[in-house]
Amino acid sequence: MTNVTEAPAIARSGTRGSIKVEPMTRSIGALLENVNLGIASRDDALFAEVRALLLKHKVLFLHDQDITRAEHVAFARRFGELEDHPVVGSDPDHPGLVRIYKGPSSRNEQYENAWHCDTTWRECPQFGAVLRCTESPAIGGDMLWANMVEAYERLPDHVKTQIAGLRARHSIEASFGAAMPLEKRLALKDQYPDAEHPVVRTHPDTGEKILFVNAFTTHFTNFHTPQNVRFGQDANPGSALLLNYLVSQAYVPEYQVRFRFRKNSVAIWDNRCTQHYAVQDFWPAVRNLERAGIIGDKPY
């Protein structure tokens, strides 16, 4: 049975109605109806309801959001300041709004696809993002998200004990820079040096524990202890196997939700406790997305 709940909301006309909330899976994601993000960008009560739903479901989906770029940016800024992406430039008229275009002239390459959490190679990774589709392919182009709170909760107890207190290095080289020419890659890394974060971070709003490793994570920085390592050659095999195991938790379908975009669909996600994957299965069709990334805080 579909579990649909309702909360007060404001429709496009400005009259108060109810947000319809339909969970997409038992783990993560909810589809919202009867809410317009242009109105939410200006209405404190409505925005507070959407934000509370985001904390509960971790990623929210909406259809038929015929809003302007200015409204898109204004809504995203209710969560915090926006940041430019180092690889994809912002709209000159709307700083912080990034266009992600794929079409016939785009290279049909898959190297950029990986489960990841945005900008963990920064000292303060993004809080989250508001992504709107302005043109979608007839087939394909879905996105998936994974609940990294549940991924942590379902780890065996002995693994939780092993990773308690572990820290890890995150590098822009591990994904975006992987296919770049050496000089460009080194320049990018010089501009965005590696960051170090706890392997298990705490959600600053909910207090939940989060498994915080992803495709940008290169290695643990404090695995080399007398308990873990007898000799130097123990460090790499032991830590690499553990890191690969932890990174692979995002691949578990029970932790995931999958969303099919159409024109004016919007996804809003909490980057602190999720990972996502954009499926590249639609070339040479066109998919045009616009994303506002929100500056986050330092993981602890």
Tell what function each PLM region has:
Residues 2-266, 271-300:
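Non-heme Fe(II) oxygenase catalytic core, chiefly the N-lobe of the double-stranded beta-helix
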